[in-house]
């Protein structure tokens, strides 16, 4: 019997924010249920009365609920060791046909606790899903084939195979033995927490009829390895934590043109390596792909809503990301700790780079900031150790505290602004954009050349934050960005006006960047 310490489960599920406890304590069943439910849903739940999330006893088939917990637990996995893959030599399967929903317990009888595989034909409802769960928890059931079943309303109910009220016993949470389930066509929705903590589940299929996967549906399915994971046309919403901590979920995810929303933490800490983002995608939630293993990301829809932060943070393998030119800001902690990212060009319409957006991108060597950028927030580029040169545009107005700290290899800084950008100061630590008392030695060097417009050096020297530097050099010869990353034929680029996506245009707009006669030009009036 697999037994997992409940608090260890909580630690694994929230490792990014929790600290590891050195000791454990047993808790009452009621307290454990409360903590489990709060962890799974993020909400407080009163277990003194039914919340409606866990089935009431009157929905449980009498033949199942009559047995007491101790007896039923003793029946679980008599043919297995703790390894769910070690099955007995002669597995038993059963083929059952129902004529009406709610009949499954009657049809299978005591065999529900003795079969390894179950094929279900005919209509099934929430009560039947309880019967299926019972066989996976109290019995031997590990494979369920619903290919020819008719799920009433096309919905797998909430908490179908995760029932904390019964799985948490004496402060421990017991997992179920389900290894594979085959879903039928006609399935539209997989309900909230339906397979939460089904940690032996390895294989699922996605029917062409599926439209939505609700929150935490497959959270903590550590062994799930369906590859590729293909969502059908008509699928619209992947809710928060849907595949959170599915650490064996590797390979490709294919999204349909119909998808509208990817919720917070949807693929958090999974190991998927590639995904497409259709143009119709409208929203990507907080930490949706944090900890994945993408090498390249391409986003084309400029109107995506970025909810929360760190949508692609901690993607250790990420080497390239392309964003639409029309993006107006980079979300907070958007690419933090993407340690293989070496080269990045901020989209031309970006005005604000939010806090921590590129924090600890240690190998970022080349960074192109757009003309028109106005603000770089706190810690936006902190610990980008590989940077050797940066050009702050003339439009820059504000630098956040610690936004440029620990640039240990920086050789030169260019600031094109005639008015020295305001440097924010952390009132608690005293940190400025280029200095922090927490800097690792040697931090950002203060004796490198800082190039500023002619006639402004004294102004920079007397500005809090900029006074960190000792070597200001006045110049009117600032470096210009190359156009190698714009897909325009060389001859054509010298004969017309193009936007930053390489599309030929006839007119320009004030405040945007264009390629004019082969050079990037920031338009501060409508003279072209």
Q: Model features per residue range: what roles?
A:
Residues 1-25:
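Bacterial Sec-dependent N-terminal signal peptides
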Residues 72, 76-95, 474-487:
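Low-complexity, Pro/Thr/Ser/Gly/Ala-rich linker/spacer regions in secreted
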Residues 90-98, 116-124, 141-154, 166-189, ...:
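Structural signature of tandem-repeat unit edges
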Residues 102-111, 127-136, 160, 193, ...:
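Short, T/G/N/S-enriched strand-turn elements that build extracellular solenoid repeat scaffolds
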Residues 159, 191-194, 214-217, 240-242, ...:
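Consensus positions within tandem repeat domains that build extended binding/scaffold surfaces
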Residues 476-504:
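Residue-level detector of functionally pivotal "anchor" positions at catalytic/ligand-binding pockets or at interdomain
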Residues 513-528:
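C-terminal tail/sorting-segment detector
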